[in-house]
Amino acid sequence: MNAKMTIWKSTLCNLERDFPSTDRVPFFAWATGKASINDFVLPSVSCEKGNFLKISAPQRMDLPVILKTSIDSSTAYKHSRLKFRLKEVAPKCYSDIMQMIGEKEPVVLVFNKVLDTAEATVSGVITNFLIHSSIQKQIILPPHFHISRDDFRIYPQDDEARLNTHLNRLNSLKADGVKTSILPIGHKGAGKSNLMRNLVNRCLSNGYEHVYVLDCDIGQSEFTPNGCISLTKVTSPLLDKPYGHQKKTFDNSYFYGDITVNDNNIDHYMDIFERLFNKFKLISEPGSVCIVNSMGWIVDEGAEILDGIIRVIEPDLCVEIFRDQTEARYSFKEFEKCKVVEIFANNSVGVIGLPNQKKLPAPLHRELTITGYFSSLLPRPTIASFASVPPYRLNFRNITICLPMDLLVEDCHIFSSINTQLIALCVKNPDLKTRKLNGKQDMPSLSVIDSTSPALQCIGFGIIRGVNVEERSVYVVTPVNLLKLQEPPLLVRGMRIQTPSQFFTADPYNRCPYVLNLPDKSSHASANLDGLYEPSINTTQFKRSRRF
C-alpha cells in the first residue's frame, strides 16, 4: 500500500479505518462523484477483482500519491447506487456508513494495507522505507500508510492548464487515426520520471486506448532493470515506482549494456532507439500515442542525444520540467516553440509538518528495481528466500557468454567472473563474433562486446546461481521461462550493472547465494579442464560505499 497520500478538498470515507470488517485489496474506488490519483481519473466501478488498483508512494522516494476528489455537477448524485455497492462490499455495516454520510455527496474509497510481493520485498531492504520514522509509533499494525490533507501541487495551475490544452489538441488527432508522440525533458532530479508517469495516466484518462512508452533512460529504466532501451504498451495507470511494475519478459527491448552513454557509443544508442521507434510505427494501432522516457541529461552528449531523438520522432509535444532556475536548460534550436510546454515544478517534497529524510541515491534506486524484477520468484517476500529459488540448468555446449571489453579476463577466470553476476538474457544474433572457450567444443562460446557488435535483443535478466565445471553446467535464476525458448539465450554482462549487494547479505543463516562446484585436481575430470578452476579475481570497475 502507499506510504503517504495527499488529499485535496475531499470528503473521504475510509472503510478500513472506521469499519474494520471490510476486506478488499489493494486500492479500490467506486460510487458516484469524481476522483483522480496522480491525474488518472478513477472510474465508478463495482466490486470486482479486475477493478482493483495498486498505488505506492514510499516516504523515502519523496513525492506522495496525490488524490483529488470533486463532485460531478453534470450528473445527479445517486445515494441509492452508493447504498447498493456498500451493501456489496460491507454487508454488516453498510447502513451505519450511509447514516454517517447523510446528505453529503462523497467519493467512497476502500483501502487495504496488503502489500504485494515486490513492495514487501523492497520495504524490507531499507529502514523506514514506506513511512516517515517520526510517525511510525502512531500506527499500530504494519504495513504502514499515512494520509495528509495538504494542498500539495506538483505543477503550477497555469502550467497545468497549458499542458491540458496541448493534450486536448493531440486527443483531437486520435479520432483521425493519427499516431502522436510526446517527449518529456528535464534535468537530473527535476521530476521527469514522475512527469512521464503522469502523462501516461492523463492519456489513459483522456480516452487513449493504445499508450506506448519508449523507455530510453538506461540509468533509471521504468519497466526493465537498468541498461535496456525498451518499448512497452501500457494498459493500466502507473501509480507506483519502477520496482512495482517490472515486466518478467520483454517483447521489444534491447540491451545497451551500460547505465550511461559515452562518445563512442552514441551511434549504438541511437541505432537501438530508432529501431524501437520504427517498431512502434509498425505495430501500434491507429490513434496510438508514444511517450518517450528520455534520460535526465540535457547538456553536452545528453543534448546531442536529445537532438537525435527529436530528429527521429518529430514529437507533437515536448514537455520540459525543471525545479532549479540555475540548472542548465535544453536548447530546442529549430524545434517549434509552440509545441513546447515549460513546467516549473514545486520544489517542496514530502508532507507538511514532517522533517525531510535523506534522499535515496541513484544506485540504490537501480538496486530496488532489480530486486522488484526478481521478487516474483521469491517464495516469501524477503530477499533472504532467494537461496530457495530453483535455477535453470544450461549446458556449457549450448551457451554463449558475452563480456564487455573492459570486463574481459583470461579464459581460466571466465567462470569466476560471471558467477553471482546479473546478466541480460538476449536472443542469439548471427552477426555476433564468437569463439569456443579454450578452443574446446564442450565449453561455452565467448564473445567480446565492443562498438562494432550488433544490437542484442533482450528478453529478460537472470543471476548466475552457480557453475559446475565437472558437469559442464551453468545454473541461472530468472523469471523468464527458459523451457519455452527454442534455444538458450546469450548470457550478457553489462558495465556497472551488478547483482544488488542485498542478495549476498540478507540471508541470516549466511547461506551462499551461489555454487561453484569444481573437480579435485587429482581427479580424472580435471585433466581436460586446463585450469578453468583458477580462483576468482576482482572485476569490479569501481568501489562504492554508502549510508542510508
From Swiss-Prot:
The keyword Kinase applies. Signal peptide: none annotated. Keywords: ATP-binding, Kinase, Nucleotide-binding, Nucleus, rRNA processing, Transferase. GO terms for biological process: cleavage in ITS2 between 5.8S rRNA and LSU-rRNA of tricistronic rRNA transcript (SSU-rRNA, 5.8S rRNA, LSU-rRNA); rRNA processing. InterPro entries: Clp1/Grc3, CLP1_P, P-loop_NTPase. The keyword Isomerase does not apply. GO terms for molecular function: ATP binding; polynucleotide 5'-hydroxyl-kinase activity. Its main location: nucleus. It is an enzyme of class 2 (transferase). Its EC number is 2.7.1.-. GO terms for cellular component: nucleolus; nucleus. It is found in: Nucleus, Nucleolus. ATP binds at residues 186-193. It comes from the Eukaryota. Belongs to the Clp1 family. NOL9/GRC3 subfamily. Polynucleotide 5'-kinase involved in rRNA processing. This is Polynucleotide 5'-hydroxyl-kinase nol-9. It comes from Caenorhabditis briggsae. The lineage of its organism: Eukaryota, Metazoa, Ecdysozoa, Nematoda, Chromadorea.
